């Protein structure tokens, strides 16, 4: 349960959900999102988890058991996490760099733009992937053990920052940005809420099927899916309360995405909580990363008959190599574009 919850709780919870909520009607968006979670998110999660438990196999083999022609759906469910992780681990590497900077100098790197333009990012990308590989290497037990430590720590740190943030003078502006109803239900806000449900709960990405294949027959799937969706939504709301009051108090731009975490928020939070914001970011990144890696590892084990050790090593190294262009796309490979996007942005857009 905690491993599946960790897969759903990702970096997007820290900046994407609160920002979408603020830009698409505030409390109105939240209501729309919760309705979609109940009528689509949880049912789809239950279907995927039930399929995984019924077959006990990876996404490709699971869909093949349902119908041979449905195998292609499972193939896309394996390819997507493979590509996403190559991009995700680059950001994970940035986070580790920031955590180490705080641990050694009690400060963030001076220039985020200069840092991501340097080849050094490849090293941190490697370190992050090595951690994900080490956890997946130990199998489901290793993933569950890591999640039991990281998820509670994540919530504790977030609550600490949340309490400090709402006590800032002028914090009400940030809270109004998130929660104040703004307009009615528009097509764009409904579309944003629907897309966020599938993105945030990691639906149709093979993750839920993979974790479902590890569930015992005694596990209550409706209850588990409800708890996962509830934890994911709660963390996203907590993140908004923790981050956006400070963003508005200090006159920052709320729609910066990753740049908000790495470029501007360190200046805001260093006097408040030091590197805690990056500890939170690391916990969300690593739990999602091991879930993404586990999908392709499970595929290699079930479809190709590989041992876990071989699958984790080969797939992990392959993902690392695939992520190198993204890591270098702000510097050495900065002139290379795909449809007018940098390699990093193009992979992220996919």
What are these regions (language model features)?
Residues 1, 119-123, 231-237, 275-278, ...:
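Loop-to-transmembrane helix boundary motifs in multi-pass membrane proteins
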Residues 33-42, 77-102, 123-137, 152-165, ...:
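Hydrophobic core segments of alpha-helical transmembrane domains in multi-pass membrane transport
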Residues 144, 148-286, 290, 310-311:
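Membrane-embedded translocation segments of transport machinery
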